[in-house]
Amino acid sequence: MAKLLVLHGPNLNLLGTREPEVYGHTTLADIDQALAAQASTAGHAVESLQSNAEHVLVDRVQAARNDGTAFILINPAAFTHTSVALRDALAAVAVPFIEIHLSNPHTREPFRQHSYFSDKAVGVVCGFGADSYRYAMDAALARVRVAGA
């Protein structure tokens, strides 16, 4: 059984009510519940954490190095375009990760079109709403099976 970590960045606690025309009506609790079921069906465990505080996410990424986390799925949200600290933490722990976005940042404002994470990620899944998480989990589960975790 592998342990997967799902990290949600700032404002994602407002999913379902914040700009539903951009982010949809699915709540973060709905997403976390679906991911836990998806991983459990495959025989794996998921831990999810949402924080509006950069240091909380950095601390959790650093802890992943020693707690048996096999894979990280992260929606850095607004930190996508600003957080060198979170990027450096992900690079330092060397746990593979997938970057996730509900919307497609490449079709949005210019400042949203650059990611500090994409070049370090195994892959990026964006633009499919809440399904972006499901697709990313599919990819992560395939990779932990291949790795024998």
Curated annotation (Swiss-Prot):
E.C. number(s) listed in UniProt: 4.2.1.10
GO terms assigned for molecular function: 3-dehydroquinate dehydratase activity
Gene3D superfamilies in the cross-refs: Dehydroquinase, class II
Key word rRNA processing present: no
UniProt binding sites for substrate: 75, 81, 88, 102-103, 112
Keyword Nucleus annotated: no
Family: Belongs to the type-II 3-dehydroquinase family.
Catalytic-site annotation from UniProt: 23 (proton acceptor), 101 (proton donor)
UniProt source species: Stenotrophomonas maltophilia (strain R551-3)
Pfam families, sorted: DHquinase_II
Subunit architecture: Homododecamer.
Name listed for the protein in its UniProt record: 3-dehydroquinate dehydratase
Superkingdom in the source lineage: Bacteria
Catalytic activity entry: 3-dehydroquinate = 3-dehydroshikimate + H2O
InterPro entries per UniProt: DHquinase_II, DHquinase_II_CS, DHquinase_II_sf
UniProt function note: Catalyzes a trans-dehydration via an enolate intermediate.
Pathways involved: Metabolic intermediate biosynthesis; chorismate biosynthesis; chorismate from D-erythrose 4-phosphate and phosphoenolpyruvate: step 3/7
NCBIfam families, sorted: aroQ, PRK05395.1-1, PRK05395.1-2, PRK05395.1-3, PRK05395.1-4
Site residues (Transition state stabilizer), renumbered to this chain: 18
Gene Ontology biological process: amino acid biosynthetic process; aromatic amino acid family biosynthetic process; chorismate biosynthetic process; quinate catabolic process
Record keywords: Amino-acid biosynthesis, Aromatic amino acid biosynthesis, Lyase
